[in-house]
Amino acid sequence: MKLKIDNKEVEAPEGKVLMEVIRDTGTEVPSMCYLKDEEHFTSCMVCVVKDRPSGKIIPSCSLNAEEGMDIVSEDEEVREARKTALELLLSEHVGDCEAPCQISCPAHMDIPLMNRLLARGQFDEALQVVKKDIALPSVLGRICSAPCEGACRRRSIDEAVSICLLKRFAGDEDLKSEKSWQAPQASPSGKKVAIIGAGPAGLAAAYYLSLKGHQCRIIDRNQKAGGSLCKEVDALELPPEVLQKEIDLIGAAGVEFELNKEVDAQTFQQLVRALDAVVVAVGKGESGVASWDLPMHARGIEATGNTYQVGDSKVFVAGSALRPAKMAIRVLGQGKELSFSVDQFLRQEKVLGEPKIFNSRFGKLIPAEYAEYLKESVEGKRLEPAVKEEGLTKEQVMEEAARCLHCDCRDLETCKLRIYSDAYAADQKRFKSEERLTCTKQYQHDQIVYEASKCIKCGICVRITEKYKDEFGLTFIGRGFEVVVGVPFGESTAKGLKTAALEVADACPTGALSRK
């Protein structure tokens, strides 16, 4: 039979689901409750399309293609309908995509993943997670003001996890090793970048741009690299040799240093003319910047939003040159973020800055949820080193890291609710109710975790367990707005999912059912 999809005539066999016909044309149709080869459920309404003759919005997962159909797979009306469907699902979805500690970290480091790796004794892997976002882990582990610890949910139960000490340990272990870890680098781009300023912002910008394949040279008027880290931090708090070792690792990544060199207005213009990009990362008190013919405001150089680009030029700016900043982690984070913008500029892409994605958040835990989150943690208060200068021992690190509550989602990268909410710019608060569901975590099964507050009642897990004919399986319990998915008769997930556990975890469109 023949029908039209987006004004193109296509052929399809009788009885084929409309969604599959549209997908066969190469057009993606989002869906969260559709399970191929199983009876349709039509609960999420994210897969809607438009019937052109009638103008009706219809669910593509529950209709078979018919002769003569004329379908619009997506237009503004369809997008708005899908967005509304997602916002309704989000109104009852109680779960964080990223943990509060990660969100509050100016460098946006994946703190929960670092903690899990350290708790398992996977120190090398933990370092790799840290250095993905923090170029100077040993340094920052000693001097960071730790906004992440202020946001740590463990703090509301007893005391925050010692995140900075854990980060420091990962960095220190690398410095002690015979051969320090070096991140893989992209193929050389042939592009040359000057970074003016060897403080935390400049060091981070150069490090991450070098990893992206660009030839970087840091220019600084001082005899030593480090900027404010050398001048403003007590040597007892940050031993100079620790700072120098981490700077040397940045040099080992291919970054060149031209120290003891003053950059005046003429030199700056020469750099701009000669190179592919210039990063201004000078510290506080660099009054000469005002003569460099850059747009200025009362606090520093003017740059565009999160891209750190000066207008549409090849000049980018971060750190105190942008605005005064007291936190080393903040300017270091800016240097990392800036590297994405410079890389996009050098590759002649649209300059958008570091990619951001939708992030579900539900706020503070209520006391009734403390016990639920502690199920995946260990009891005991925060550990402190016997001698501050020496940090935590390996055994203490594993114990302290295990105090993490695992607030982030296990399916962070694959959650369809997150992916589609980002694609359709869904607003989590649009249909937000005054009261939210209480978070629960069921760990009875040895392979999966069930978090009912993240469930969108798509019915996929119910249909899969029906197929396996387990004694209990999963089913819908209750009626109306009170309905939940669970194991019948109050049985555990261990009894309900004897056969299909991993299959339902992999098929779940959110992080409600996930692998341990």
Model-found features: residue ranges?
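Ferredoxin-type iron-sulfur electron-transfer modules and their immediate structural context
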Residues: M1-K192, L275-I301, G305-V317, A321-A507, ...
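Residue-level marker for well-ordered alpha-helical positions
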Residues: K16, L203, E241-Q244, Q266, ...
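Positions that flank functional sites
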Residues: D37, K224-A225, A265, G480
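Hydrophobic pocket-lining residues within nucleotide cofactor-binding pockets
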Residues: A65, A225, E262-V263, A321
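Beta1-alpha1 glycine-rich phosphate/pyrophosphate-binding loop at the start
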Residues: M109-L113, L118, L127, S156, ...
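Residue-level detection of beta-strand scaffold positions
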Residues: V193, L209, C216-I219, G254-V255, ...
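A Rossmann-like FAD-binding core segment of flavoenzymes
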Residues: E237-G305
